[in-house]
Amino acid sequence: MNDINMRDQADKLRNLARKSAVDSSFDTPCPRMIVVGGGKEGIGTSTLAVNFAIEARRQEQRVVLVDAHPTRGDVAKLCHVDHPWTLSDVLTGQCSMIEGIASGPHGLQILSGVQKKPLSEDLTEFTYRRFFNQLTRLNDQADLIIVDIGEAASDTATYHWSAADLVCLVTT
């Protein structure tokens, strides 16, 4: 049963990657974007994303770390950041991208993930286009955007795959 389940997850990831390779709808220039995702919960995507971000800061890059995990945000906890705004607030228009970003350790800029309730699966394509449009406006404050999407086999992950310059899949 587990082998079948793992194959199903891997198939979903491959299909998402294929679909995003064809979809080039996010053609507005923005800082280089790395998306980190995995095949299942709890395999360390947040830890890897935070470490990528810290290493990029050591190389004097300006980094925005976005926690886009749809069900729980761990990046802020790992970085000991407490900020009133989250990704949910940016997506629903309750705050701007700039307002949502908090200062973190090592000079990281962090957009915290969801804390109380999961992201709604019915967020529209327009919502994500608006979100990525706001990311493009970060040219003045970011050289690199690192996005932790957690379990990568969600419908919303497609938007992140499509916008990424580089995708890092964490496997077990």
Language-model features: locations:
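Extreme N-terminal, non-catalytic leader segments
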Residues: 1-39, 96
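Short gly/ser/thr-rich secondary-structure transition/capping motifs
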Residues: 17-20, 91-94, 127-129, 147-151
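Walker A/P-loop phosphate-binding motif and the immediately C-terminal alpha-helix
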Residues: 26-71, 75
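Short loop/turn elements that form and flank the Walker-type P-loop nucleotide-binding site
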Residues: 29-30, 59, 104-105, 140-142, ...
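P-loop/Walker-type NTP enzyme "switch/lid" segment
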Residues: 38, 65-140
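Short acidic, S/G/P-rich loop/turn micro-motifs used as interaction or catalytic elements
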Residues: 43, 117-119, 153
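Structural motif
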Residues: 62-64, 108-110, 145, 167
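Conserved catalytic-core segment of NTP-binding enzymes
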Residues: 130-133, 137-172
